[in-house]
């Protein structure tokens, strides 16, 4: 199945629809203007809709699958995800392994290899999330004694100057 994103006048995705591959193949093929025009004739634009742009469900073109609120960048020919936080800046060379692709935080992600030792002597990774109010990464220590007994969760923050997790 082929997927097409409806874009508004600011290239923001309004919705994504599915079209049979055979219809795309018969009308110019993948990523063609002809296929986009065919979809426009087949499925009328709504509201501020201006154009249809094909998107790839398996990310084989245009960087990533478009979602509602994403932006299409015509000069780079790719879809950009919604900005997650006001302090983050666009970085189209972002790393998916670092947890972000299109947007970069002002403080680098600590990484999955930052670990703590739980009360039973087991090593475990922190679960990091961004705190916009404090401009820092905060992590959880989740202690699990057994499958039925979750222990106390401890909050920490990442201190990039010392490269350590510190208690909140």
Q: Where does each model-flagged region fall?
A:
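Viral virion structural and adsorption modules
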Residues: 1-168
